């Protein structure tokens, strides 16, 4: 079982990672607007991996509660 401080720290870290992913999504929209689909596709693939990692971290926290 994770202690409360560790859970809090992990949630803070996850919030930072979510904010970073949101900025990356904005970049992807810009690439699409510029018809740079290859770059947008690559950025979206990176975001997908980041979101899968976040989902795993959420599942770990939930299992520790």
For each feature predicted by the language model, list its residue ranges:
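Short, charge/polar-rich alpha-helical segments
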Residues: 1-16
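Short, charge-rich amphipathic interface segments used for partner binding and complex assembly
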Residues: 12-65
């Amino acid at each position: 079982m994770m202690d409360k401080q560790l859970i809090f720290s992990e949630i803070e870290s996850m919030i930072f990672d979510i904010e970073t992913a949101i900025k990356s999504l904005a970049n992807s929209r810009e690439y699409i607007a510029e018809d740079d689909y290859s770059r947008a596709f690559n950025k979206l693939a990176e975001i997908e991996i980041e979101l899968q990692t976040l989902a795993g971290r959420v599942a770990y926290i939930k299992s520790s509660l």
